Structure formats: structure tokens, C-alpha cells
């Protein structure tokens, strides 16, 4: 290229020299271009005349050096002209090299491009509409955002780039990934270079599309992708929760099984040493559930808290328990059922229900609220519909430091009138519950009396019902602070606590204060208030009350001492009573059931459960041959009438084989699409039920205990009720039956003979039924009349004459159609009238129907007999009008359909339905096992009740003996 450039420069110099333009001059040497300076010194003859000519070929060149310019040819104008032209050409070259430098080109392009961009921006700006008129649409606060938002503060809050880089995981090298993709793309294009390849076409296709079309297509595809993604996400979420639900149901079912299988004998738990009061409370819990004729559960000591509604019973009990554990209401009945509270000393202040493992921390207000709510729920749950109170006992244990050991029962408060919303018998029910507990001769009655009301105005004093001696009653006067303020005569309080006002004597008299009446008061504040009141009270200061008769602390100590004294005096006597009860029950069992084990209701249920499951398992032992035989037989019994009456007989009335086959195909198709699959599944379901019942009946005969009959019958009925046949079975069965009925090719002679035999048996059965109907219509013949002394009725005589006349008509016209013409009916009626027989046309047609049916069946049997040797003609497709056996082919198709259907149903039964039925039986047994009421209803009898009583009495006696032993050790 340098040579070409030099040639261009020489041509330019020659042109300039030829025109004799310019003046000879020399520029300073120090300002020459280095290349020009080198050329100037090298080829200046006057300065260096002795230097030999330069040989460019011998010089070493590098990529950074410039090639030397060739010396121009000498001009014919002499030495001076040549020198002038040489200097002129170097000046022009220097000027061109300065002007054509790259930085000037780039700078000029940038200036021009910026100017063009500015013009374009101004043009676009002028094209936009003026939106200043719509500034009112934007709220004012938008314009003030820049003043309210402190960007510097926000930037300081945001983390630095180094901190974010520490938090982020190591990112991949995107530069390397880009280089790899570029390299892969170059390989693909290189490999596909010879022609218009698919890769090239795929890469160039988007370029040919218009931007508008591509934007629309991209928008459509993006919206569709979003919808698809949302649907997939919804399905994934639904499947996720479905799996979670199935897992929870499975876990719940497994836990139910564990609970059902858990009993005291099966799972050996570690024995935990229980306290004395816990052992005694456990005996009382068992007694509360034990309902026997001996009524011994009421003879063990306990403290019964009785009194009027809102007298402060619950408050006194809470002060003894040192926690606000009961739900409260202003004047409303809150205690709706008896609550047995077992108090004992422990390191932590906690409460727990008998049938629950949850501990309520009484030091936390949240647990206290939850405990009160749980007690209220249990009370409302125990109350039956239409009632206000319930006799069912709620068992609760409270442990804590400084709590006296005893068992208290809080009873519903006695009311004087029944208010709105209460049951009509609420007053009597409450009195009955209180009386039932107080009749226990060993019960300690804690009688609560409101001290703020007049003693004579008290509605009920249940403690008086136990006799004037009051040897089991402890009298408690509450709200003494209000009584001191309201009563003008303090001596009345002294008379009450000394037992002089009421006509009874009690074990002790106490006066307590249970707060100021606020529901939010804590136990500690109530205690402080009570102590402050009695310290400053005039009643105690003046000697009207003794120090040991005041405060709930003294009350709890006295009640506890009295309770344990009563327990020590009576518990051994009660243990002897239970021992006698056990002896009586065991004697009754030995005399009535000497060879039977003592199984209670739960044990009997487990035994019956195993027997039922064994009976269900026996269904899987039924042979396939037996299943298919009974299925085929029952299915044909169900569909035979439809096949004969609606398919075969109408098609047989046609005159040629083509019409016969067409009619048969149409009716078979309609039958298969609508009725046949339903009938087949009904038959299969009934067969499964019958086999299940048959196996249970057979198992029952083998020394079966009849006590399980009601349970087994209920399990069978409920399992069959829950069982639903597989929905997909009908569709597959319809296709199989349709394909079986479409086949007309009888391949061998045995199949042909089997079809003929099937047809003969079917037609003979129909002929027998028809003869029976005709005999009933016409009455007994002469032989039966003479031998059996039977006569015909007038109607039978008329039908007999009609039959004779119609038989003569059939003999004359053997190929008669199935229906009589009107003129034929008239002719028969006229002939009968000529013999003195009056007959109705409807009777003639009815008789004709049965006679023609018998005539047709007889002809069909004769034709069937002729077709025995027709298999050869059928196989060779001979056309013989006298031997067309299309009806044999029809019965072969029906028979084959029955065989295939029976086989299919048998597979569904053995592979699926028997297992599903077994699963249903297990679920029903599990549900029955959880329902105690249903078990009581299904497993009944004196034997069961006697075993239940024996088990309970033994358990009570064992626990009482263990309690007595621990009580003696404590002494």
C-alpha cells in the first residue's frame, strides 16, 4: 500500500511541476516530518554527493517501521527543476497527512451526529401534544414528593456494594459463559455455511418479520405463558395440599388404630408412684363411671360444696385451690354440672383434666383463661338438648405449693325460680343432684351461706336436710365484709357462727371474705384484703368471732383434716363392701357361664372384629369357575326376558335373513349402549353381597356365639351401603360387550352345538311358561276334572271355546302373522256367537297372543333341530332358504357375550372389589370401635353386663386396697 501511495504522490508532483507553479523555497529543517527529513538528507545531491545509492532490498524492516519511498525519476528539466518538484510534493504530502488524521474524522462525526440528534429530538418534541392542561389530574402531593423524600438519607440506609457481595453466593462467570455461547454459535454457523440451513433460517426468520407483528406475537405468547404458569402453580399447590391432607388422614387413622389397640394389658407402661390423694381421686373417677345396682359408689368420702346461686361457692373453692379456675358471670348460672376438683400439694401450680394430658400453668393468665374456657365448654357439652344442667361429673386435678389435700365437688347453685332460657325442671334437677351427693353417709357437706342477706330470707339450706345433728356439715358464711356494713346488729353474725340462729349443729362454723366482687381480682389481692379486713374487723376485735373461725386458709385446713379423718374411718369398710360385691358377681358368673371367659364389651368387640375379617378373607378363596358360573346364570336370568321379547321375537317375524340381521344388530347396539352394562354391574354387586352373606352364615354355624349376630349384621349392612363399584368399570365393560356382540363368526362345530343347546333350553323354558299360562286361562282339562274334581269357571269356558276356534285358524294358516286382522277377529266372534258363546274382541286378541306365542316357539324348536346339521352350510356360506340358521348365530352371540361378561366381572371382583369391600369392612369396624353408644347397642345381654360389672368392681377393689396400703404406710 505504501508503494501505491508513493506512486500517487509522484503523479501529483509531476502534475504540479509540469504547470510550473509555485516559488522555490525551503522550510526549516527542524520542522520537517521525520520521514521527510530522512528522504531529504538521503537524496540531496549537493549535501552528500559521494554517498552511494540506497538499496532498499538490503534493509531490514519490522512491523513498526515504514517502507522507504522510491526515488522519483529525474525530470528532463535539469537538476534544479527536480529539486523544486521534490520539495513541493513533500509539502502537499505533509498537509494531507495532517488533515486526514483519525481524530479529526471522529470529532467531526461526533459533532455532526450530535447536531442531527438534537434536531430529531426537537422535531419529536414538537410532535407531542401539550399536556399542561391536564396537570390538575395529578394530585398535589406528587409534586411535593421530591421535597419530602430525603434521597441522601435513603442512600445512607442502603447497604454498601461490598456488604451485598458478601451476602450473595458466588456468581458464575458470565463473561466465560458469553464466550462459550459465541464460540458455539460460530461453530454452528460454520457447520451450516454451505447453504440455507435450518439454523440460519431460524436465526434470520425474526428479522424478516415486522416489528408490530413481532410485538403482538410476543405479547400474546407472554400472556399465554403467564396463564399457563399460573395454572401450573395452582395445580402444584392443589396437589401439594392434597398430599398433605392424605398424609394427615393416614396419620390420623394410624393414631386411631393405636388408641383402639391400646389397653392396660397390651401396653406395659412404666409405673409412676402416685400420691395418696391421686390414688383416692382415681378410685372416685372410676366410681363416677360405674353404674351398678349396688349403689356403692356414693359411700366414699368427698367434700360436697352446696349453697344458693351466687352465694360464693365457686369463690370459696377458688380460694382453697388458690387460682381463679372457674368461669364467672354476673348473676348468670355458670356451674351447669358437678365439678370434682382433686387438690394436692406439688412443686408447680398446675391443673389437668382426667382425660387429657395437657397441663395448665395457673401462674399464667393465658393458661387460666384457656382452663376456664375449657371448663365452660365441657359443661355445655355435658348438658343434653332441652336441659339446663347435667348430672355428669367433670374431673379436674389442681396441684400447687401449700394446697391442702382433699377432693371437693362443686355442685350447681340452688335456685328459687326458673328464669327465661332455663328448662322447666331445672330447679328439681339441681335439687336432685344435690340430694344424690348429700345422701352419701360419708360425704362432708360444705354449706355456703351469703352473709350479706338476711338469714331468714335464705331460699334453701341444704345442710339442714342431713338432720339437726349436722355431724357432716361445715357451715361457711361468705361476704362478711358486706354483712358488717349492712347489718345494724353484729350480734346476728355471732349467732350464725355459733350455731344458735339455725336449728342444727355443724362440725364447724367459718366466716370468710372472698374479695370485693370484682372478677379481675387476683387470689393474692383477695388474701391480703381478707387478712386486712379481719385484722381490723370489729367482729374479731370484740370477740364475736374467734381467730380459728376466719379466713379461707383456716377453712381449708379444717376441711382437709375432717376429710382425711372421714377417709380413714370409712375406706376399709367400703373396701369390704366391694369385696362382697365382687364375690356375688363371680358366683353369678360361675353358675350361669361356667365354660366362658369373662370378656367385657371391648374384648368381645375385638373378638367379633377378628371373626368378621376372617369371613371377609374367605371371599378371596372362591374359585374363578364358581364366580363365572353364578355370574353367568344370574346375568342370563336378568336379561333373558329382554332378549327373547324385545330382540328375538320381533326380529323373527321378518321374512328374510337380511332384515333379521339388521333388526338384531340395531336392537343389540341400543341394548348395549343403554341397559346391558348397568344390568351386568347390578348382577355382580348382588352376587358379591350374596356370597358375603353366605360365608357369614356358614361361619355362623361353626359353634358361633350368637352374641355377635347384631354386630355382624350391622357391619355387613353398613359395609354394603358404603361400597361403590368402580366407576371406570362400566365404560370398559360396555366396550367389551359391544365387541363380543359384533362378532358373528362361529369357528368350530362344538361352539355351534353349544349355541343350539343354549337356544333349545331357552325356547323350551319359554314354551313351558307359555303352556302354563294357557292352562290357567282355559282351566283344567277333562282328565283333571274327573281325577281331581275340578271345574272350569265361566271365563275359562269362554277362553276354552275361543282357543279351539283360534287353533283351527292356525291350522289353516300356519304362516300367519303375529297379529289378527280386524276381519279375522270379527269372523272368530261370529263363529263363537253361532255356538252361543258371547266373547269380547279384547279377550280374543289376548288368547291369540298366547296361542301364537306357543305356535311360534314350537316352530322355532323344530327349526333349531334342523340346524344341528347346518354348520357345514354356515361355514361354506351356502345360500339355502330352507336352512337359514340366523337365530342360532344370534344365540351364539348372546352366549359368548355372557361368557365374556362373566369373565370380566369375575376379574373385577377378585382383583378389585373384594379388596375394596374388605377395606370398607375394616373402616366400619374402626368407626364402630370408636362409638361406645353403638357398641352398647350392638353387644348386649346379661352376660356382657355381668362381665363389665366384674371388671369394674375388681378394678375398684384393687385400687382401694393399694390406697389403703399406702394410707397405712403414711400413718
Curated annotation (Swiss-Prot):
InterPro entries: Dynamin, Dynamin_GTPase, Dynamin_N, G_DYNAMIN_dom, OPA1_C, P-loop_NTPase. Disulfide bonds join 867-885. Residues 478-481 are annotated as: G4 motif. SUPFAM superfamilies: P-loop containing nucleoside triphosphate hydrolases (SSF52540). Residues 333-336 are annotated as: G2 motif. Residues 90-98 are mitochondrial matrix. Pfam families: Dynamin_N, OPA1_C. GO terms for cellular component: dendrite; microtubule; mitochondrial crista; mitochondrial intermembrane space; mitochondrial outer membrane. Cleaved by OMA1 or YME1L downstream of the transmembrane region in response to different signals to generate soluble forms. Cleaved by OMA1 at position S1 following stress conditions, generating the short soluble form (Dynamin-like GTPase OPA1, short form; S-OPA1). Its EC number is 3.6.5.5. Residues 116-781, 793-971 are mitochondrial intermembrane. SMART domains: DYNc. Residues 213-224 have a biased composition (Basic and acidic residues). It is an enzyme of class 3 (hydrolase). Residues 219-265, 906-971 form a coiled coil. The chain crosses the membrane at residues 99-115. Residues 512-515 are annotated as: G5 motif. Mg(2+) binds at residues 314, 335, 410. Residues 782-792 dip into the membrane without crossing it. Residues 747-867 are annotated as: Paddle region. Belongs to the TRAFAC class dynamin-like GTPase superfamily. Dynamin/Fzo/YdjA family. Dynamin-related GTPase that is essential for normal mitochondrial morphology by mediating fusion of the mitochondrial inner membranes, regulating cristae morphology and maintaining respiratory chain function. Exists in two forms: the transmembrane, long form (Dynamin-like GTPase OPA1, long form; L-OPA1), which is tethered to the inner mitochondrial membrane, and the short soluble form (Dynamin-like GTPase OPA1, short form; S-OPA1), which results from proteolytic cleavage and localizes in the intermembrane space. The paddle region plays a major role in driving mitochondrial inner membrane fusion. It binds lipid membranes enriched in negatively charged phospholipids, such as cardiolipin, and promotes membrane tubulation. A conserved intramembrane region, named membrane insertion loop (MIL), within the paddle region inserts deeply into the bilayer, further stabilizing the interactions with cardiolipin-enriched membranes. OPA1 dimerization through the paddle domain promotes the helical assembly of a flexible OPA1 lattice on the membrane, driving mitochondrial fusion in cells. This is Dynamin-like GTPase OPA1, mitochondrial. It comes from Oncorhynchus masou. The lineage of its organism: Eukaryota, Metazoa, Chordata, Craniata, Vertebrata.
Amino acid at each position: 500500500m505504501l508503494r501505491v501511495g508513493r506512486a500517487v504522490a509522484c503523479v501529483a508532483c509531476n502534475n504540479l511541476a509540469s504547470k510550473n507553479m509555485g516559488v522555490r523555497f525551503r522550510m526549516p529543517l527542524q520542522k520537517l516530518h521525520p520521514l521527510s527529513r530522512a528522504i531529504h538528507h538521503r537524496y540531496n545531491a549537493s549535501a552528500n554527493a559521494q554517498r552511494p545509492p540506497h538499496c532498499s532490498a538490503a534493509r531490514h524492516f519490522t512491523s513498526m517501521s515504514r517502507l522507504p519511498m522510491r526515488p522519483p525519476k529525474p525530470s528532463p528539466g535539469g537538476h534544479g527543476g527536480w529539486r523544486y518538484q521534490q520539495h513541493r510534493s513533500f509539502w502537499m504530502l505533509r498537509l494531507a497527512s495532517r488533515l486526514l488524521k483519525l481524530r479529526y474524522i471522529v470529532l467531526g462525526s461526533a459533532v455532526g451526529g450530535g447536531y442531527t440528534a438534537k434536531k430529531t429530538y426537537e422535531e419529536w418534541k414538537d410532535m407531542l401534544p401539550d399536556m399542561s392542561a391536564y396537570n390538575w389530574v395529578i394530585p398535589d402531593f406528587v409534586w411535593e414528593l421530591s421535597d419530602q423524600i430525603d434521597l441522601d438519607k435513603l442512600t445512607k440506609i442502603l447497604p454498601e456494594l461490598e456488604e451485598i457481595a458478601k451476602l450473595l453466593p458466588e456468581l458464575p462467570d458470565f463473561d466465560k459463559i458469553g464466550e462459550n455461547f459465541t464460540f458455539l454459535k460460530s461453530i454452528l454457523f460454520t457447520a451450516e455455511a454451505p447453504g440455507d440451513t435450518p439454523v440460519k433460517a431460524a436465526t434470520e426468520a425474526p428479522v424478516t418479520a415486522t416489528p408490530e407483528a413481532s410485538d403482538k406475537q410476543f405479547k400474546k405468547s407472554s400472556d399465554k405463558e403467564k396463564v399457563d404458569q399460573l395454572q401450573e402453580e395452582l395445580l402444584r399447590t392443589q396437589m401439594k395440599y392434597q398430599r398433605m391432607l392424605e398424609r394427615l388422614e393416614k396419620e390420623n387413622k394410624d393414631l386411631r388404630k393405636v388408641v383402639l389397640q391400646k389397653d392396660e394389658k397390651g401396653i406395659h407402661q412404666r409405673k409412676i408412684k402416685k400420691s395418696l390423694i391421686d390414688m383416692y381421686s382415681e378410685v372416685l373417677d372410676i366410681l363416677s363411671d360405674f353404674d351398678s345396682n349396688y349403689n356403692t359408689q356414693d359411700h366414699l368420702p368427698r367434700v360436697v360444696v352446696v349453697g344458693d346461686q351466687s352465694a360464693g361457692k365457686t369463690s370459696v373453692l377458688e380460694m382453697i385451690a388458690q387460682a381463679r379456675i372457674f368461669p364467672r358471670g354476673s348473676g348468670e348460672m355458670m356451674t351447669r354440672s358437678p365439678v370434682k376438683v382433686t387438690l394436692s400439694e406439688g412443686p408447680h401450680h398446675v391443673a389437668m383434666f382426667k382425660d387429657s394430658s395437657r397441663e395448665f400453668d395457673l401462674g399464667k393468665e393465658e393458661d387460666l383463661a384457656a382452663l376456664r374456657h375449657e371448663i365452660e365448654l365441657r359443661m355445655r357439652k355435658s348438658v343434653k338438648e332441652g336441659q339446663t344442667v347435667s348430672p355428669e361429673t367433670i374431673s379436674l386435678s389442681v396441684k400447687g405449693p401449700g394446697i391442702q389435700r382433699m377432693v371437693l365437688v362443686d355442685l350447681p347453685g340452688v335456685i328459687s325460680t326458673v328464669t327465661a332460657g332455663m328448662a322447666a325442671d331445672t330447679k328439681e334437677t339441681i335439687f336432685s343432684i344435690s340430694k344424690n351427693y348429700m345422701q352419701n353417709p360419708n360425704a362432708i357437706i360444705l354449706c355456703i351461706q351469703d352473709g350479706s342477706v338476711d338469714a331468714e330470707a335464705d331460699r334453701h339450706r341444704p345442710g339442714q336436710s342431713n338432720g339437726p345433728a349436722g355431724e357432716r356439715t361445715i357451715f361457711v358464711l361468705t361476704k362478711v365484709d358486706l354483712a358488717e356494713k349492712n347489718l345494724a346488729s353484729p350480734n346476728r353474725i355471732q349467732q350464725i357462727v355459733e350455731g344458735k340462729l339455725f336449728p342444727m349443729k355443724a362440725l364447724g362454723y367459718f366466716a370468710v371474705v372472698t374479695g370485693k366482687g370484682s372478677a379481675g381480682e387476683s387470689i393474692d389481692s383477695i388474701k391480703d384484703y381478707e387478712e386486712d379486713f379481719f385484722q381490723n374487723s370489729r367482729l374479731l376485735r370484740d370477740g364475736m368471732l374467734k381467730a380459728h373461725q376466719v379466713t379461707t386458709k383456716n377453712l381449708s385446713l379444717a376441711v382437709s383434716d375432717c376429710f382425711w379423718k372421714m377417709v380413714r374411718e370409712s375406706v376399709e369398710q367400703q373396701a369390704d363392701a366391694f369385696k362382697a360385691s365382687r364375690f356375688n358377681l363371680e358366683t353369678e358368673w360361675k353358675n350361669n357361664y361356667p365354660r366362658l371367659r369373662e370378656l367385657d364389651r371391648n374384648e368381645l368387640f375385638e373378638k367379633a372384629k377378628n371373626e368378621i375379617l376372617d369371613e371377609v378373607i374367605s371371599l378371596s378363596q372362591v374359585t374363578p369357575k364358581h364366580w363365572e358360573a353364578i355370574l353367568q346364570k344370574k346375568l342370563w336370568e336378568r336379561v333373558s326376558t329382554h332378549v327373547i321379547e324385545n330382540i328375538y321375537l320381533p326380529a323373527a317375524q321378518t321374512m328374510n335373513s337380511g332384515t333379521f340381521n339388521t333388526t338384531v344388530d340395531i336392537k343389540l347396539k341400543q341394548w348395549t349402549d343403554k341397559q346391558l352394562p348397568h344390568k351386568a354391574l347390578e348382577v355382580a354387586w348382588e352376587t358379591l353381597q350374596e356370597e358375603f352373606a353366605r360365608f357369614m352364615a356358614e361361619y355362623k354355624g361353626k359353634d358361633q356365639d350368637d352374641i355377635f349376630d347384631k354386630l355382624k349384621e350391622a357391619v355387613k349392612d353398613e359395609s354394603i351401603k358404603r361400597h361403590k363399584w368402580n366407576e371406570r368399570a362400566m365404560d370398559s365393560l360396555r366396550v367389551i360387550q359391544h365387541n363380543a356382540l359384533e362378532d358373528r363368526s362361529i369357528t368350530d362345530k362344538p361352539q355351534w352345538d353349544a349355541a343350539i343347546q343354549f337356544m333349545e333350553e331357552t325356547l323350551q323354558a319359554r314354551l313351558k311358561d307359555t303352556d302354563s299360562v294357557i292352562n290357567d286361562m282355559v282351566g283344567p282339562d277333562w282328565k283333571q276334572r274327573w281325577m281331581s274334581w275340578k271345574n272350569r269357571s265361566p271365563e275359562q269356558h269362554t277362553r276354552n271355546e275361543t282357543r279351539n276356534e283360534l287353533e283351527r285358524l292356525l291350522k289353516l294358516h300356519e304362516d300367519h302373522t303375529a297379529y289378527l286382522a280386524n276381519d279375522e277377529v270379527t269372523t272368530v266372534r261370529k263363529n263363537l256367537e253361532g255356538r252361543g258363546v258371547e266373547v269380547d274382541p279384547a279377550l280374543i286378541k289376548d288368547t291369540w297372543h298366547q296361542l301364537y306365542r306357543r305356535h311360534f316357539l314350537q316352530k322355532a324348536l323344530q327349526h333349531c333341530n334342523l340346524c344341528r346339521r347346518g354348520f357345514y352350510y354356515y361355514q361354506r356360506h351356502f345360500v339355502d332358504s330352507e336352512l337359514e340358521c340366523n337365530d342360532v348365530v344370534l344365540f351364539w352371540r348372546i352366549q359368548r357375550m355372557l361368557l365374556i361378561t362373566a369373565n370380566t366381572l369375575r376379574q373385577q371382583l377378585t382383583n378389585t372389589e373384594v379388596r375394596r369391600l374388605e377395606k370398607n369392612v375394616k373402616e366400619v369396624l374402626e368407626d364402630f370401635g370408636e362409638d361406645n353408644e353403638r357398641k352398647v347397642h350392638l353387644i348386649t345381654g346379661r352376660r356382657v353386663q355381668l362381665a363389665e360389672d366384674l371388671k369394674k368392681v375388681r378394678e375398684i377393689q384393687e385400687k382401694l386396697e393399694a390406697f389403703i396400703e399406702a394410707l397405712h404406710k403414711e400413718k
